């Protein structure tokens, strides 16, 4: 998404707020009146600019034909601390949604996970970083995965052999986690596909 000018942001915020309050987008005349434009045509020019930048879609032939493409409730969910025994993407674990394009990652990211600890620092995954995760159980040895052991969620490099799984850290100060699949509950929650440093820009 290209950055919006201050005026374009005003128009976008007005559309979003109007939809939130009334259930429908404003007309060009209402935008012009609210923001002090001389005519609805001026509002139309700003709408076209917003459409070019990919944040709205203009539906032709309708006075209220504006559709938001950048909805704050959409985007990648950010998962924080996970309570024992509950699904990773349970609503209570989601701290918010962030406008990160899933296709920036290969394969596409499905959610972000806030990293806790420094066990993977040697490959650049730091405490507090946001890890982009592709939700899948189809993973191979050597890949960095998000795994759940009993009720604990961890990020490690996978090494599986028979009934034994080793979850390898990327920090010599940490020891591998060894899982006996005959005795412990073990689930792959997803594959790490990228990292966003500390989330400071979010």
From Swiss-Prot:
InterPro entries with a match to the protein in the record: LexA, LexA-like, LexA/Signal_pep-like_sf, LexA_DNA-bd_dom, LexA_repressor, Peptidase_S24_LexA, Peptidase_S24_S26A/B/C, WH-like_DNA-bd_sf
Active site: 119, 156
Annotated region of DNA binding: 28-48
Family annotation (SUPFAM superfamilies): LexA/Signal peptidase (SSF51306), Winged helix' DNA-binding domain (SSF46785)
Domain of life: Bacteria
Site positions for Cleavage: 84-85
GO molecular function: DNA binding; serine-type endopeptidase activity
Family: Belongs to the peptidase S24 family.
NCBIfam families: lexA (TIGR00498)
HAMAP family, sorted: LexA
UniProt function note: Represses a number of genes involved in the response to DNA damage (SOS response), including recA and lexA. Binds to the 16 bp palindromic sequence 5'-CTGTATATATATACAG-3'. In the presence of single-stranded DNA, RecA interacts with LexA causing an autocatalytic cleavage which disrupts the DNA-binding part of LexA, leading to derepression of the SOS regulon and eventually DNA repair.
Protein name, as recorded: LexA repressor
Record organism: Citrobacter koseri (strain ATCC BAA-895 / CDC 4225-83 / SGSC4696)
